[in-house]
């Protein structure tokens, strides 16, 4: 295992000053892309994801459409300037293609695609700053963008990450913990339905540690959900005030 440049955990405190069960600062804005049908920006600390939704609209070419449900397409992409490392190529990497598929499969259970036969819904996600947990921040942003677009949904999907750092379960991995920790578990969760839609286990986990991690992920997701719900509510309250002058 690679040695981290700084200790990841000392006396129960993480390198960035958080306790094991603390999220980084969560910031959420809705309606940030003016030409999209729905959009959202989600920041977990220094990780920021922007999602834009276009649709539902007619599928082209038509032979790819489905008669009884819509098709959702998801593209996850990291901006060339998003990391402190070398500028990445703008061409989608194998990792980005794989994460795009994972995010689509996590979002589909939340969306009532049967309401949109012969249609498509396109979801574009751009990571503009990366410091760990990019796929789960993307999941939250994409879910909010779908809701902002008025897409029929069973529930919002909230993404959080948990991991193992020096044998301790921690919430919301930053970049150092992501790179040097002993394991990570990205989680997608629908808080109202109490249903997991994404679990990707990496590393060796004992059963009791895995269950502890799941419980911590649920608590983190419920915390983020409240912020996400407030962001949606605030947007539409401000629209109502503009229309009705209240």
UniProtKB/Swiss-Prot annotation:
<keyword id="KW-0963">Cytoplasm</keyword>
<keyword id="KW-0540">Nuclease</keyword>
<dbReference type="InterPro" id="IPR036345">
    <property type="entry name" value="ExoRNase_PH_dom2_sf"/>
</dbReference>
<keyword id="KW-0271">Exosome</keyword>
<dbReference type="InterPro" id="IPR020568">
    <property type="entry name" value="Ribosomal_Su5_D2-typ_SF"/>
</dbReference>
<protein>
    <recommendedName>
        <fullName>Exosome complex component Rrp41</fullName>
        <ecNumber>3.1.13.-</ecNumber>
    </recommendedName>
</protein>
<dbReference type="InterPro" id="IPR027408">
    <property type="entry name" value="PNPase/RNase_PH_dom_sf"/>
</dbReference>
<dbReference type="GO" id="GO:0000177">
    <property type="term" value="C:cytoplasmic exosome (RNase complex)"/>
</dbReference>
<dbReference type="InterPro" id="IPR001247">
    <property type="entry name" value="ExoRNase_PH_dom1"/>
</dbReference>
<dbReference type="GO" id="GO:0000175">
    <property type="term" value="F:3'-5'-RNA exonuclease activity"/>
</dbReference>
<dbReference type="GO" id="GO:0003723">
    <property type="term" value="F:RNA binding"/>
</dbReference>
<dbReference type="Pfam" id="PF01138">
    <property type="entry name" value="RNase_PH"/>
</dbReference>
<keyword id="KW-0269">Exonuclease</keyword>
<dbReference type="Pfam" id="PF03725">
    <property type="entry name" value="RNase_PH_C"/>
</dbReference>
<dbReference type="GO" id="GO:0016075">
    <property type="term" value="P:rRNA catabolic process"/>
</dbReference>
<dbReference type="InterPro" id="IPR050080">
    <property type="entry name" value="RNase_PH"/>
</dbReference>
<comment type="function">
    <text>Catalytic component of the exosome, which is a complex involved in RNA degradation. Has 3'-&gt;5' exoribonuclease activity. Can also synthesize heteromeric RNA-tails.</text>
</comment>
<comment type="similarity">
    <text>Belongs to the RNase PH family. Rrp41 subfamily.</text>
</comment>
<comment type="subunit">
    <text>Component of the archaeal exosome complex. Forms a hexameric ring-like arrangement composed of 3 Rrp41-Rrp42 heterodimers. The hexameric ring associates with a trimer of Rrp4 and/or Csl4 subunits.</text>
</comment>
<dbReference type="GO" id="GO:0010467">
    <property type="term" value="P:gene expression"/>
</dbReference>
<dbReference type="InterPro" id="IPR011807">
    <property type="entry name" value="Rrp41"/>
</dbReference>
<dbReference type="InterPro" id="IPR015847">
    <property type="entry name" value="ExoRNase_PH_dom2"/>
</dbReference>
<keyword id="KW-0378">Hydrolase</keyword>
């Amino acid at each position: 295992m690679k040695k981290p440049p700084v200790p990841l955990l000392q006396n129960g405190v993480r390198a960035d000053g958080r306790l094991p069960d603390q999220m980084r600062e969560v910031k959420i804005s809705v309606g940030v892309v003016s030409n999209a049908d729905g959009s959202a920006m989600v920041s977990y600390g220094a990780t920021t994801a922007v999602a834009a939704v276009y649709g539902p609209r007619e599928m082209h070419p038509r032979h790819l459409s489905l008669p009884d449900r819509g098709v959702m397409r998801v593209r996850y992409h990291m901006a060339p300037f998003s990391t402190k490392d070398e500028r990445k190529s703008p061409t989608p990497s194998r990792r980005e293609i794989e994460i795009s598929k994972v995010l689509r499969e996590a979002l589909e259970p939340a969306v009532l695609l049967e309401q949109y036969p012969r249609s498509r819904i396109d979801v574009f996600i751009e990571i503009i700053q990366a410091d760990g947990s990019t796929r789960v921040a993307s999941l939250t942003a994409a879910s909010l963008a779908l809701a902002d677009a008025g897409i029929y949904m069973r529930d919002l999907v909230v993404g959080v990450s948990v991991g193992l750092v020096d044998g301790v379960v921690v919430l919301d991995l930053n970049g150092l913990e992501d790179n040097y920790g002993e394991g990570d578990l990205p989680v997608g969760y629908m808080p109202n339905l109490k249903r997991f839609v994404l679990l990707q286990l990496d590393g060796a986990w004992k059963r009791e540690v895995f269950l502890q991690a799941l419980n911590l992920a649920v608590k983190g997701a419920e915390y983020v959900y409240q912020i996400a719900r407030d962001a949606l509510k605030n947007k539409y309250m401000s629209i109502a005030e503009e229309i009705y002058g209240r």
